[in-house]
Amino acid sequence: LENLKQYDQVLKLCEKLIQIDPKDTWALNSMGISLNELDRHKDAILYYDTTLVIDPNDVTALMNKAISLSHLGNFQDAINYYDLAQRIDSSLREIPPAKSKLYEKLNMPDEAFLAAQGVLNKDMEKIKSDAKENKCSIFHQFCDDEFKNTNSE
């Protein structure tokens, strides 16, 4: 039904599933996704939050909450949720460009560059601090760090 864009039908079916099992994270996430598709982002967040109470490491809920927050203009919060998802599953290729675009919207080009490279938020400050200390650009510092890491392996 999602593929057919019948989101109202998905909502009805998921409500039935949730009545049977209120901890069905698949149904909760599907509710949120369908609500997102219907531009009901605040409602969607409630379902992602419920999922995250049940499983704080549910990457689907983290990513979709980030999407909802982004649609609502809460870019920094969205970035933080993408970052949590990235810490749990660093193989997700859609996270770095999504974080980068949000940093661009916040007019933070250095962070946008680092996010696009897959750098976690917690590691950005060190790179920025090292660049300042070494009197070089963020780009140069990142490349220098990558070169050093490659040679140490």
What are the residue ranges of the model-derived segments?
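Terminal, low-structured helical/coil segments at or just beyond the last alpha-helical repeat
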Residues: 105-153
